[in-house]
């Protein structure tokens, strides 16, 4: 009897299991009812109660049994009434379970199935975090991913919202983990807002909004490491060759490597251009197996490629000249970064070096041929020399010391000629300033025959000599050898009489007004009113000297008609009175009018400097001395 009962239990269990595998317990034809409190889906770790109520015809159940996943529960079962029982679970932690209950009826050899139900426990979704949308180069899709948080253990759905910032159009995409959105379906421009909403039976959460620009989320095509080689240089180095099919110009990459026995990655970063095959150099330990990975991103952007598949390379024990070897690739993505870089061409590795070597050989051969031609061909050598002489400046090959060709000598000669031409102008500016001026009076000297010889002529003259003597200022010109020291003095006041006729003749020079015609003697008509001592020079010398002073001083602009008349009179007296026997002091008196004109020539006021340059007077007095001799 017991064996029959066991067989019936096995048949019922197999039937239930078969029915569950083809549709679940919920498809069983129930002879009662089963329910779960608080719900069939609940938060993991809660206390739950499962109720079973029988509704079998012609059966008053003696016992009610609970099964979880095909295993009979023997504890925590409570009989509520004749047809109902309860199974209680504390801190239920199983994500999924299948529950059913049976009843023992009188006059039945096996348990009768009442009903069954699936229960689930889990968690509400976390807020989706780290929402990322990228466009892999050449894919044509925008791939959006996010961090879903902890596992919910129950069915959770995610809705991706994409809203255009330009057209305000919003699209929703239902998914369970990530989503690929065709770029052709994004017709709302380049700028979008993206956010993710997560929901399950226990709750709903929404992520933050992500603003994207379609041009900023492009990731270059994957980089691939192709081969490695170790070169025996001064210090052995390993070169890793890698490439990418990207069309993006500015790309930043990272390469990481480590020994297979090590857990720490070494990372190098660099910028590159995939016009050429990339070469990354490493100085590694010999006889050690290393692993390499690489990834890239568009320069200045946020998103990186996933790490490339693993590439293995073992450094040799004794480094040969060049060792090349390709290794298998393992697919493994994660990690850190690195690499220093030099570029090589897309052709073979040694082709660039061979081309450089051939170029150097051709250049050396051509140079040797040209050198031999220059040595044995004289005309060729002469032609080259002429062309070189035309190109280089003359001062590189002129005779040294050939001073006549020197530019410095020519410059000095030009400066010397310029100074000689301007010497007459420069001498006007180098004379010292006259700082001492004194007034003197001529002492009275009255010989015994003074009244007899000169009374008549003095009384018969119509010329107003008293006014001239009172108002005229003269300048004393001393001997040339002692320097020029002018002295200004006035004649004796009115009522004083000179005692010597010779003194009057030498100091006043008062001929008749009509004795000389200004039109017939233009050489003398422009001289100022001044007098010279006749004891030192003759009348001819005085005439020449006065003419030269006229040319130098150009007194026509400053001499008044009265002064010109006095000049004519004084010149006449110089020509008439040339007695060398008279003894008069060597002192020359110059009128103020003459000195005033000289001050104007020097562009200075006569009241400040009533003199003229000494060198000019010296030159003219030297000429007078020569005429005397």
Curated annotation (Swiss-Prot):
Coiled-coil region: none
InterPro entries: FN3_dom, FN3_sf, Ig-like_fold, Type1_Cytokine_Rcpt_Type2
Signal peptide coordinates: 1-23
Source taxon at top rank: Eukaryota
Major subcellular site: membrane
Tissue note: Expressed by monocytes, Th1, Th0, NK and dendritic cells. Isoform 1 is specifically expressed in NK cells.
PTM: Phosphorylated in response to IL23.
Single GO BP term: positive regulation of natural killer cell proliferation
Subcellular localization(s) per the UniProt record: Cell membrane
SUPFAM superfamilies linked: Fibronectin type III
Family: Belongs to the type I cytokine receptor family. Type 2 subfamily.
UniProt subunit comment: Heterodimer with IL12RB1. In presence of IL23, the heterodimer forms the IL23 receptor. Interacts with JAK2 and in presence of IL23 with STAT3.
Known role: Associates with IL12RB1 to form the interleukin-23 receptor. Binds IL23 and mediates T-cells, NK cells and possibly certain macrophage/myeloid cells stimulation probably through activation of the Jak-Stat signaling cascade. IL23 functions in innate and adaptive immunity and may participate in acute response to infection in peripheral tissues. IL23 may be responsible for autoimmune inflammatory diseases and be important for tumorigenesis.
Disease implicated: Inflammatory bowel disease 17: A chronic, relapsing inflammation of the gastrointestinal tract with a complex etiology. It is subdivided into Crohn disease and ulcerative colitis phenotypes. Crohn disease may affect any part of the gastrointestinal tract from the mouth to the anus, but most frequently it involves the terminal ileum and colon. Bowel inflammation is transmural and discontinuous; it may contain granulomas or be associated with intestinal or perianal fistulas.
Annotated protein name in UniProt: Interleukin-23 receptor
Species per Swiss-Prot/TrEMBL record: Homo sapiens (Human)
Gene: IL23R
């Amino acid at each position: 009897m017991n064996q029959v009962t066991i067989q019936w239990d096995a048949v019922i269990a197999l039937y239930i299991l078969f029915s569950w595998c083809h549709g679940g317990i919920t498809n069983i034809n129930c002879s009662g009812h089963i329910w779960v409190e608080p719900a069939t889906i609940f938060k993991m770790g809660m206390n739950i109660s499962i109720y079973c109520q029988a509704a079998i015809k012609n059966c008053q159940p003696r016992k009610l049994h609970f099964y979880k996943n095909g295993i009979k529960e023997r504890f925590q079962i409570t009989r509520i009434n004749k047809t109902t029982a309860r199974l209680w679970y504390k801190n239920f932690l199983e994500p999924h379970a299948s529950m059913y209950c049976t009843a023992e009826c009188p006059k039945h050899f096996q348990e009768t199935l009442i009903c069954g139900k699936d229960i689930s426990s889990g968690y509400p979704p976390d807020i989706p975090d780290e929402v990322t949308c990228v466009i892999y180069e050449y894919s044509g899709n925008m791939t959006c991913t996010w961090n879903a948080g902890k596992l919910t253990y129950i069915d959770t759905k995610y809705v991706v919202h994409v809203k255009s910032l330009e057209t305000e159009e919003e699209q929703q995409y239902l998914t369970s983990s990530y989503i690929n959105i065709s770029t052709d379906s994004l017709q709302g421009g380049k700028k979008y807002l993206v956010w993710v909403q997560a929901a399950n039976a226990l709750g709903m959460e929404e992520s933050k909004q992500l603003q994207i620009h379609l041009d900023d989320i492009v990731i270059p095509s994957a980089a691939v490491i192709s081969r490695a080689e170790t070169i025996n240089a001064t210090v052995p180095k390993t070169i890793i060759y890698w490439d990418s099919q990207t069309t993006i110009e500015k790309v930043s990459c990272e390469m990481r490597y480590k020994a297979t026995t090590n857990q720490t990655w070494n990372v190098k970063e660099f910028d590159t251009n995939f016009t050429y095959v990339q070469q990354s150099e490493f100085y590694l330990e010999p006889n050690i197996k290393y692993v390499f990975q690489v990834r890239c991103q568009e320069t200045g952007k946020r998103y990186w490629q996933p790490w490339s598949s693993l590439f293995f390379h073992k450094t040799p024990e004794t480094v040969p000249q060049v060792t090349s070897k390709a290794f298998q690739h393992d697919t493994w993505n994660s990690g850190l970064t690195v690499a220093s870089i030099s570029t090589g061409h897309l052709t073979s590795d040694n082709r660039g070096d061979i081309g450089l070597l051939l170029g150097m050989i051709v250049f050396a051969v051509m140079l040797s041929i040209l050198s031999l031609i220059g040595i044995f061909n004289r005309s060729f050598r002469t032609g080259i020399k002429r062309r070189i002489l035309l190109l280089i400046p003359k001062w590189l090959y002129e005779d040294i010391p050939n001073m006549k060709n020197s530019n410095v000598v020519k410059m000095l000669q030009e400066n010397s000629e310029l100074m000689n031409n301007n010497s007459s102008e420069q001498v006007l500016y180098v004379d010292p300033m006259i700082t001492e001026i004194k007034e003197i009076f001529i002492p009275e000297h009255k010989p015994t025959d003074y009244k007899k010889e000169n009374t008549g002529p003095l009384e018969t003259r119509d010329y107003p000599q008293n006014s001239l003597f009172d108002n005229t200022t003269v300048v004393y010109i001393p001997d040339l050898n002692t320097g020029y020291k002018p002295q200004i003095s006035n004649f004796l006041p009115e009522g004083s009489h000179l005692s010597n006729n010779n003194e009057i003749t030498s100091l006043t020079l008062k001929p008749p007004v009509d004795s000389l015609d200004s039109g017939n003697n233009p050489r003398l008509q422009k001289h100022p009113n001044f007098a010279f001592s006749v004891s030192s020079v003759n009348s001819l010398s005085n005439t020449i000297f006065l003419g030269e002073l006229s040319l130098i001083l150009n007194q026509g602009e400053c001499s008044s008609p009265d002064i010109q008349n006095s000049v004519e009179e004084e010149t006449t007296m110089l020509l008439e009175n040339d007695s060398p026997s008279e003894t008069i002091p060597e002192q020359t008196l110059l009128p103020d009018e003459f000195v005033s004109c000289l001050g104007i020539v020097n562009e200075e006021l006569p009241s400040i400097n009533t003199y003229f340059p000494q060198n000019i007077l010296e030159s003219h007095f030297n000429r007078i001395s020569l005429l005397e001799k």
